Amino acid sequence: MRVKISLKCSECGKKNYYTDKNKTAKEKLSFRRYCPKCNKHTVHSETKL
């Protein structure tokens, strides 16, 4: 089963992206994505919806 999550910018805290992941995965996801508020690429970490 997959659960929906959001990806939050580590610098400004804005939730910019939404995705899903496997429920059995223990580690948190983190990606380098573009943040329109910061106007640059930053690390986005997994948070609950």
Swiss-Prot record:
Q: Which residues cross the membrane?
A: none
Which cellular component terms (GO) are annotated to the entry? cytoplasm; ribonucleoprotein complex; ribosome
Looking up InterPro entries in the UniProt record yields: Ribosomal_bL33, Ribosomal_bL33_sf, Ribosomal_zn-bd
- List the molecular function annotations (GO) for this entry: structural constituent of ribosome
Q: Which GO terms describe its biological process?
A: translation
Instruction: Name the domain of life.
Output: Bacteria
List UniProt keywords, sorted A-Z.
Answer: Ribonucleoprotein, Ribosomal protein
**One Pfam annotation, family name?**
Ribosomal_L33
The family note in this entry says: Belongs to the bacterial ribosomal protein bL33 family.
PANTHER family membership:
50S RIBOSOMAL PROTEIN L33, CHLOROPLASTIC, LARGE RIBOSOMAL SUBUNIT PROTEIN BL33A
Q: What is this protein called?
A: Large ribosomal subunit protein bL33
